[in-house]
């Protein structure tokens, strides 16, 4: 039988991997906008549909780590959770097609930082999951 700690690591790993792929997709879409392969309205329509699922899944990851008493990983995820909460409170999480070219550099930078964060967390969670499953045996 799998322990709750192993379940937390597996669930967080899957959600974190999905968020990482989502951010890579966003970076590709922003690059397409720079190269004029996609228009701003289509970009905003596609990416705005993906913003809340990312925020919700990252919130779920953070809550699972808190419930699983994985304090160090919880604290590592807390700054991004605060960043997401700040975006939602100030309503800057939604992309505006009329403003996207002026804010493109900031959005690309934020997405590269998120990709890096999710990549580091992915391998950290993978290591923790493997160690947790080995210790159960």
From Swiss-Prot:
GO terms under biological process: endoplasmic reticulum to Golgi vesicle-mediated transport; intracellular protein transport
InterPro entries: Cornichon, Cornichon_conserved
Stretches assigned to the Cytoplasmic side: 1-9, 84-114
Keywords carried by this UniProt record: Endoplasmic reticulum, Golgi apparatus, Membrane, Transmembrane, Transmembrane helix
Keyword Transmembrane carried by entry: yes
Molecular function GO terms recorded: signaling receptor binding
Main location: endoplasmic reticulum
Segments crossing the lipid bilayer: 10-30, 63-83, 115-135
Extracellular topological domain: 31-62, 136-137
Superkingdom: Eukaryota
Cellular-component GO terms for this entry: COPII-coated ER to Golgi transport vesicle; endoplasmic reticulum; endoplasmic reticulum membrane; Golgi membrane
SMART domains noted in UniProt: Cornichon
Cellular localisation: Endoplasmic reticulum; Membrane; Golgi apparatus membrane
Membrane topology: Multi-pass membrane protein
Keyword Oxidoreductase applies: no
Function text: Regulates export of the secretory proteins from the endoplasmic reticulum in COPII-coated vesicles.
Family: Belongs to the cornichon family.
Official protein name in the record: ER-derived vesicles protein erv14
The organism of origin for this protein: Schizosaccharomyces pombe (strain 972 / ATCC 24843) (Fission yeast)
């Amino acid at each position: 039988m799998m322990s709750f700690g192993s379940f937390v690591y597996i669930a967080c790993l899957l959600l974190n991997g999905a968020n990482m792929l989502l951010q890579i997709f966003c970076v590709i879409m922003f690059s397409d906008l720079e190269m004029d392969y996609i228009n701003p309205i289509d970009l905003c329509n596609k990416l705005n549909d993906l913003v809340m699922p990312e925020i919700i899944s990252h919130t779920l990851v953070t809550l699972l780590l808190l419930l699983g008493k994985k304090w160090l990983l919880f604290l590592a995820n807390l700054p991004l959770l605060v960043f997401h909460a700040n975006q939602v409170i100030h309503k800057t999480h939604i992309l505006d097609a009329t403003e996207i070219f002026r804010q493109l550099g900031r959005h690309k930078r934020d997405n590269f930082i998120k990709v890096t964060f999710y990549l580091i967390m992915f391998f950290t969670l993978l290591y923790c999951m493997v160690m947790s499953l080995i210790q159960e045996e």
